[in-house]
Every structure is written in C-alpha cells, then in structure tokens.
C-alpha cells in the first residue's frame, strides 16, 4: 500500500517552499482544493456550512459523520464531524443554538475547528427566515517527524512539530418554506492568518456557501424526490455539488438513496435508512481528477433527533423518526 505522506513529502522536498506549501500541497492531492472539508451528504451537516441552520428543526438534532480519504493510501487519514443543535423559544421569539467540531487529519497534517453557533428565527412569507452567527477556534498542526524524506536535514521538515491556532467567525442566512429551503453564508469572516512555528504561516481565505433544496411529491404519497445543490467559493476555487435523492416512507420503513456530482471533483452515490430513530447512511465518492476514481472517499453518517419539551413539566423527551 502506497504511503500518501511519502508521496506528498517527495513533491514538497523538490520544491522546498516551506510549511505553507506543505499544507497547500496535501489538500490539493486529496482533492480538497478549498480550506474546508467537503462532505457528500452536505445537507446532514448544514451547521458546518451555515450557522443560521441551527434550530431550523423542532428537535434536538445530533449528527456524526466520518469520511475516509484516498482509498488505497495508508496515510490518507479521515475527516470527522460531530454536531448538535436545538431550537428554543423565549416568549414569542424562536432561537437556535449549536456546537460543532471538525477534525481533519491526513498523515502528518491536522486541522481542527470548534464552533459555537446562534441563530434567530423569524416568520416571513409563509416560511421562516433565520440569521445566524458563530465563533470558531481554528487549529493547525504539522508533524514533521512523520515525514519520510531522502534528506534528513531537509529545511521543510527539520523543524519538527509546527502548530498554531486562531479565532474566526462566520455569519449566514437561511430561509425554510414548506417544500423548499435556501441558505447563504460567509465563512472565515476574519480571514485569519495562522502562524505555524516561528517562520511559517497559513492564510485562510473567506469562503461563501450557497445551498438550496426542493421536495418534489410524486403520485405515490410514499415517494419523494429531493434535488439539492451546494456551491462553495473561496475567492479562487468554485465547487458545486449537485444531488438527486429519492426517499421512501411507507409500511413503517424509511429508506433513501441518491447520487451526487461535483464537476471537476467527484461523482458519488449513497444509501441510507432510519432504524429505531437512528438515521444511518453510507456513501462512496469517486474522484474524477487528482488521485483518480479508485482512490475515492468512504463516508458514513449517523443522525438522531430527540423531541424536547423545554419548560413543560410532566412530559419526557422522546425520539423522532422524521426525515433528517
């Protein structure tokens, strides 16, 4: 099995442009041209993309997603997302809060983001408009000791471990109607610069996300078609994910599946079901450039919803099996 770390290190060693190039190089190799990780099932991790999505649904929403990178490479690493959000009322006003954690690791490189989120929801035009904001803590690290190079004194890796952190912020809007939704967010509002050791730094560009989806009923009440789109732009690269889902909800069963296409990036498919309130989904995303189709990403997501009756005595929370 080929080592992804060795492959990246050999490329960087020939260039010798320092730690910043290392970070940029490894993200390009695994087809993450942008700073933030990309999940194929992006509608499940909406709070990661837009803080205004927290509290969009009535229940406490918990989600864990794991994506492995570059199948066939032993140092490829993975991306983990964990998030929870909930809605609550103060008088006649509705609000949402959430917490998210992203841990993205590939070989000797590690990226972490912890976010605290808030959104205000207001009825508008037969739907609900939410305005949200979040505070982030970004952390980057490079473990130079894991690099396998031909030159033990290579200046790129001779410094050993390099790490740094910085505060950041994001804002967003999200509109939800009966059959459709749309959201727009600006991430990395402060465009922070993260210092890695004494001589290197990583500049994080502001990024813009737009997502939308529509539930299309069919002549069969138990089948729904849901096309959706996510467009991300960081000032340099554009990535658009186009998704088609079909959902079955009948005879006590909830099943769904679909395909996702990101032009110039990847094509993928997924299948999921709801079992005793737990939403379980598996997908495979094949790269259409970079490392190639065979070195794709496996993705597993788990979601769970719990109805909360805050402030109402004598009633216990119980699970919900509504669609995620």
State the predicted function of each range:
Residues 34-324:
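Subset of outer-membrane beta-barrel
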Residues 1-36, 307-324:
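Cleavable N-terminal export/targeting peptides
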